[in-house]
Amino acid sequence: MKYIGAHVSASGGVSNAPLNAKSIGADAFALFVKNQRQWSAKPLTKSEISSFKTNLKNANISLEHILPHNSYLINLGHPDPQQRKKSIDAFLDEIYRCDLLDLKMINFHPGSHLKEIDENICLSNISSSINYILENSSGIKLVIENTAGQGSNMGFKFEHLGYLVKNSCDKNRIGVCIDTCHLFCSGYDIRSKSAYEKTMDDFGKIVGFEFLSGMHLNDSKCDLASRKDRHESLGKGCIGWSGFENIMNDKRIDEIPLILETIDNSIWADEIIALRNLIKGN
């Protein structure tokens, strides 16, 4: 079964996120558990935690289908060890917040070399940071998101993701999230059936479907291999509906959260319906 939702607002408190997901007909969602553009935030109150759990139950959404996203400030590959430690500490704080909400996973961008160090050194930094976080936390799965390769961001090749997964110290707590816009803009085509199968077969061989823990479903304003991260509404970009039809009919992608981050939240409910209608037999 496919579980579809969107990255919904937690404005006014994280307890609002399940209600916002329910309002668009979602059975999965993503959220920020703190302000994504600030290093620190007020602690979650007992009242807010309780309200989140109550609203989640009322929305009838499983914890397994929630994919929180951590701060955009975090850079686990930072060339400066002190800045890297700042990112690690911020990551651990976000895990603590997720634990309070009983969340099972946290999604993150791997990191950036900032054009100051070699890509391989940056990957090694990211890997070491991931392992430190795994060793100093418990339970929650760390879900690495692929990137478009914009600027100096790592994670735009399956080989990057495969390296980080292979070198993680706890394979039960590591996963991968594929963002379709990032995938397409980093050079992996999914538009035709044959292109999709080639791309996903490569993913299976290099990373492994057993590590696929979620997807971000976004069309792209920019063309194949553009290395630019510009999301578009489904069917209105360079990927088109055919790519999403391929995803919705791939049984290897069942039972994980499929999250919209498309640019017009006023049509998220329509996009969710459209995605479900792409499933053959529906």
Swiss-Prot record:
Record carries keyword Transmembrane: no
InterPro entries per the UniProt record, alphabetical: AP_endonuc_2, AP_endonuc_F2_Zn_BS, Xyl_isomerase-like_sf, Xyl_isomerase-like_TIM-brl
Residues bound to Zn(2+) 2: E145, D179, H216, E261
Keywords attached to this entry: DNA damage, DNA repair, Endonuclease, Hydrolase, Metal-binding, Nuclease, Zinc
Record flagged with keyword GTP-binding: no
Class of this enzyme: hydrolase
Signal sequence annotation: none
SUPFAM superfamilies (alphabetical): Xylose isomerase-like
One function term, GO molecular function aspect: DNA-(apurinic or apyrimidinic site) endonuclease activity
Residues bound to Zn(2+) 3: H182, D229, H231
Cofactor dependence: Zn(2+)
Enzyme Commission code: 3.1.21.2
Recorded catalytic activity of this chain's protein: Endonucleolytic cleavage to 5'-phosphooligonucleotide end-products
Origin superkingdom: Bacteria
Cofactor note: Binds 3 Zn(2+) ions.
Bilayer-spanning residue ranges: none
Binding site for Zn(2+) 1: H69, H109, E145
Similarity comment: family membership: Belongs to the AP endonuclease 2 family.
Function: Endonuclease IV plays a role in DNA repair. It cleaves phosphodiester bonds at apurinic or apyrimidinic (AP) sites, generating a 3'-hydroxyl group and a 5'-terminal sugar phosphate.
Alphabetical list of NCBIfam families matching this protein: nfo, PRK01060.1-4
Record-given protein name: Probable endonuclease 4
Organism: Campylobacter fetus subsp. fetus (strain 82-40)
Gene symbol of the encoding locus: nfo
